[in-house]
Design a protein with these regions (language model features):
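Aromatic (Trp/Tyr) and acidic
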Residues: 1-87, 91, 119-143, 183-204, ...
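Helix-terminus loop motifs that line ligand-binding clefts
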Residues: 37, 73, 87-120, 150, ...
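Helix-capping and short linker residues that terminate individual alpha-solenoid repeat units
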Residues: 85, 101-105, 144, 160-164, ...
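Asp-box/WD-like beta-propeller blade repeats and closely related beta-sheet repeat scaffolds
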Residues: 115-126, 133, 149-184, 190
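Solenoidal tandem-repeat scaffolds enriched in leucines and small polar residues
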Residues: 163-236, 243-248, 254
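C-terminal beta-rich recognition modules with glycine/proline-rich loops and embedded aromatic residues
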Residues: 209, 280, 342-350, 355-442, ...
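C-terminal beta-strand-rich structural cap/linker in extracellular carbohydrate-active enzymes
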Residues: 451-454, 484-501, 505
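Solvent-exposed beta-strand/loop surfaces of large extracellular or lumenal domains
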Residues: 461-486, 505-508
Length: 623
């Protein structure tokens, strides 16, 4: 079995979560997961295939991802219901599982398509089954729902009977004529099949997983059209530094690559074979060091491509961010290294939550660094990925590091931790993080106890200090854990000060401002005069020039309160609007266009995108 340096807290260990993360968590609960029409539609998609009078008119025959929706909903709802102590949502989960089980066919098939349109599946059904299995297994694990486990087992049997290495079975990667999709992402099914073996104790699933893994190289070589994932040998080469990510497969799909890495992580957790762990950690480290944006997002319109094809206006998808966060959490659990929690923080407080509408009702599929986010739409892979991670956000705040209590991320919150050989411990954060780096941590063991308290210090918090009660402040190591070992008394308190300086990411012509954990953006619709007449825009972010020195960006910035409904603080910066392009045919017409004008601009954390929307720019010109 795998070695772990950090153990996650259970969702029921989270007593409360507030602040910005809490607002987004509660919005996801109220306006997404508890939307009665949305959840109902997800399960009805599965039920319709068993109703012959509906099969010709109302079953789903397109190639893409709607069959996954119920799985991601179950996953998110189970975590959320336990964190929020929401009995009504727990009841709904049980009802959905019962209806899913009733919709399952005799051979174990659990999808949304009638038999005559499957060859062996419709479109992306292995991708869809990945999430259906995950949702069922989460409910079996967290809620002890045995019907969920049995339904997952029957689906798992269908999968390992239909695909595999034996005569008469389909390859996981191959040409499936007429199914409407290239069939190139099948290796991703590895993770939930391994997890199914863990939970059932049935060794057939692990044996199937390792046997099919041994065929990845051959299957991918025989199917060059697949650009979703890559062969096993190439994964080893990437982890070792012998290939770059865009060389794994031309136009490789970021999300599927991450999902396949999660499968190798599950194999390591089950078998303890170091090779699997080395591939995952090597890949995560290279992606973090070389391919993740400073907002935490990654890829260009879903794909890892050579760097010359990246641009701030390129689309950045939610899906690979959600599996990236899961990979980072896995690396954090294995190693206990603060860097992985820092990367989770980077993505959550910037690009990931920038894609969520502030009311929690939906997510943008794509959210570029500059331009405008794609208008949220009906159920799709990305808004379901968003609510899946949002449903478990609070579980990333705390953990046990070397069996000692640890604070991994900062947000107003409270959790009860049960560490081996220690009394029950309540940790409560009072803070306005990420707007402020001032945190009061209440440390409240049920009785006096000696233990080490681990506090993660972010890499940007130079000069961080911690003060226990009235003791002298102690300096804290930047980018690592501060470990405070002492006898803790009920009612103890630690004051943690994390300095937030204003820095920038800049080249010779463009820059982006950063304050502490937050990347900032210029939102046209958040300016005092957005220059909008009905649906006509007279000004865009690319018209803005900031008057800043990138060597000392903080000197040209003034902090002020943001509007009440927005994450702050706002940054007020002096700059100018460039002269308009001479678009009219005559000099007289062009003379009436606005001339260059100096003025103040208001920049806000990028995470406000789902509240402000419209045109924005993370990168702005400067002089």
């Amino acid at each position: 079995m795998a070695r772990r340096s950090i153990s996650s807290v259970l969702p029921q260990d989270i007593a409360s979560v507030g602040g910005f993360l809490g607002q987004r968590f509660q919005a996801n609960l109220k306006n997404r997961l508890k939307d009665p029409l949305l959840g109902e539609e997800f399960v009805r998609l599965h039920e319709r295939k068993r109703q012959p009078f509906l099969q010709w008119t109302r079953t789903y025959d397109d190639w893409f991802w709607l069959g996954e929706q119920v799985g991601k909903w179950l996953d998110a709802a189970a975590y959320t219901a336990l964190i929020a102590d929401d009995q009504a949502l727990l009841n709904k989960i049980n009802q959905v599982i019962e209806r899913l089980a009733q919709s399952q066919e005799e051979d174990g098939y659990l999808g949304i398509t009638v038999r005559w349109h499957r060859n062996p599946v419709r479109g992306m059904e292995l991708y869809e089954m990945y999430y259906v299995l995950h949702g069922l297994l989460v409910c079996a694990d967290l809620l002890d729902n045995q019907l969920a486990l049995e339904t997952a087992r029957r689906l798992g049997d269908y999968i390992i009977r239909t695909w595999g290495t034996e005569s008469g079975q389909f390859p996981l990667v191959g040409r499936f004529p007429g199914n409407g999709h290239d069939g190139g992402e099948g290796t991703l099914i590895l993770e939930p099949i391994v997890l199914l073996g863990q939970q059932t104790g049935d060794e057939r699933y692990l044996a199937w997983s390792e046997k099919t893994l041994g065929m990845w190289d051959k299957w991918l070589a025989a199917y060059p059209e697949s650009t979703h994932t890559c062969d096993y040998t190439s994964m080893k080469q990437f982890a070792a530094g012998d290939k770059d990510v865009y060389e794994l497969r031309e136009n490789i799909h970021a999300h599927t690559f991450h999902m396949t890495l999660l499968g190798l992580a599950a194999l390591y957790n089950t078998t303890g074979k170091e090779e699997y762990r080395d591939i995952v950690l090597g890949s995560v480290d290279r992606l973090a060091d070389e391919w993740v944006f400073f907002t935490g997002g990654m890829s260009s319109t879903e794909r890892y491509v050579p760097r010359r094809f990246y641009h701030p206006r390129n689309q950045i998808e939610v899906c690979p961010q959600h599996t990236w966060i899961l990979l980072l959490d896995q690396a954090l659990q294995w190693t206990g290294q603060a860097r992985y929690a820092a990367e989770i923080e980077r993505d959550l407080f910037n690009h990931f939550l920038a894609a969520q509408l502030a009311d929690g009702s939906n997510w943008s599929y794509f959210t570029p660094l500059n331009g405008h986010a794609q208008e949220p739409m009906g159920p799709n892979c990305c808004n379901a990925a968003g609510h899946r991670i949002a449903g478990r956000l609070p579980t990333y705040l705390y953990g046990l590091r070397g069996n000692a209590p640890a604070v991994l991320l900062y947000s107003a919150s409270e959790a009860v931790l049960d560490a081996p050989d220690l009394p029950s411990l309540t940790l409560r954060q009072e803070t306005n993080f990420p707007s402020s780096g001032e945190i009061i941590l209440h440390v409240d063991p049920a009785q006096p106890a000696d233990f080490a308290l681990h506090l993660r210090i972010p890499p940007y918090a130079d000069g961080a200090t911690a003060q226990i009660g009235s003791d002298q402040p102690i300096s804290a190591p930047t980018g690592d854990f501060l470990v405070i070992e002492r006898e803790w008394q009920p009612g103890d308190m630690v004051k943690l000060s994390l300095p937030f300086s204003v820095t920038c990411q800049a080249n010779d012509t463009q820059l982006a401002l950063v304050r502490g954990p937050l990347v900032y953006a210029y939102f046209q619709d958040a300016q005092p005069d957005p220059v909008v007449f009905h649906y006509h825009r007279g000004q865009y972010p690319e018209d803005v020039n900031l008057h800043l020195d990138p060597a000392q960006p903080g000197q040209g910035v003034r902090e002020e309160a943001a509007a009440e409904e927005l994450l702050g603080p706002a940054l007020r910066v002096r700059g100018s609007i460039q002269t308009r392009a001479p678009i009219f045919a005559t000099a007289e017409g062009n003379a009436q266009l606005p001339a260059q004008e100096e003025k103040d601009f208001v920049l806000l954390p990028f995470a406000n995108q789902g509240a402000v929307q419209g045109e924005y720019g993370v990168f702005l010109k400067y002089r």
